[in-house]
Amino acid sequence: SCQNTEVVDVTLYGNSITAKELKEHMYIYASDEFQGREAGTAGEILAINYLKNEYEKIGVKGGMQNGDYFMPMNVYAGRERRNIDSFNVLAFIKGDEKPDELLVITSHLDHVGVNKDGSVNNGADDDGSGTTAMLEMAEAFQLAVNDGLRPKRSVLFLHVSAEEKGLLGSEYYSKNPTYPMEDTVANLNIDMIGRVDDLHKDNPNYLYIIGSDKLSQDLHDVNQSMNDKYVNLELDYRYNDPTTLVFEMGRMRENNYYYRSDHLHFVNNNVPAIFYFNGTHEDYHRPTDTADKIRYDL
């Protein structure tokens, strides 16, 4: 929240996030040029440089202690039995009243790369949707800062990599945090919010909320009340129970979504977290997860 919220219309800044700008970002970020953004590849380097350049354009500073945007890491990809060199991207807006307390917003910048037949997995929804949303959110925050309205707490925009290798970028950050985990009040994790699943064809303005009440009832209540006040999405909690069945990859299985995205490493450090998600679809981890299928108007 920003200072002087009783006289500030926060929707002014929220409305700066437009379908047009999201689409412009996506058609670059999820293009063939980025070669599926696999961690440890040249495509990932293109992705991290794109993010850095966009943050510099909007005036949001790097989130490393030396002011840099890149957190280099060498991580072991167990599924492939090899180490890879990869990078998280961090951008930072300092808070006003409680600058040492931190809200961390996450999405993963990587995807699964190129198939053996040369087809590119563009990863528009997974997780170009979360990545581009974060860029636009950061710009909205910075517009408020430019008007003299800093958030009460500091905000770290953390684009983690190697999520597709096993949540490795968020694990690395949790073990090597730029800001103390004990000062991190919450994590908001955004992964796959660009499509409409089969359960919501009749009401596309929805969002799955996962984990909001696991460590903090306050976080759950604030999330619900802010939704009711400003955007009025249908908040669907069915997957908050990890045992709820989902049809995925050709079969029914327990969803376990609470354990399958980058918020997990914050939760494991006792940081309350919410996972924002719109569900899976037939293009999940396929070359058909492309920018033209994203619902930018949602």
How would you label these PLM feature ranges?
Residues 12, 17, 21-24, 28, ...:
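Extracytoplasmic/secreted proteins, especially bacterial periplasmic and envelope-associated proteins
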Residues 89, 105-166:
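Alpha-helical metal-binding/catalytic segments enriched in His/Glu/Asp
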Residues 37-93:
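A non-catalytic alpha/beta surface segment that caps or lines the substrate-entry region
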Residues 33-36, 55, 61-62, 77-80, ...:
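Solvent-exposed loop/turn segments at secondary-structure junctions
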Residues 160-267, 271-273:
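Metal-dependent peptidase/peptidase-like ectodomains
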Residues 29, 83-113:
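Acidic/His- and Gly-rich active-site-bordering loop/insert found
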Residues 9, 277-298:
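His/Asp/Glu-rich mid-to-C-terminal helical/loop segments that flank catalytic regions of hydrolases
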Residues 1-11:
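Bacterial Sec-dependent signal peptides at the C-terminal "C-region" and cleavage site
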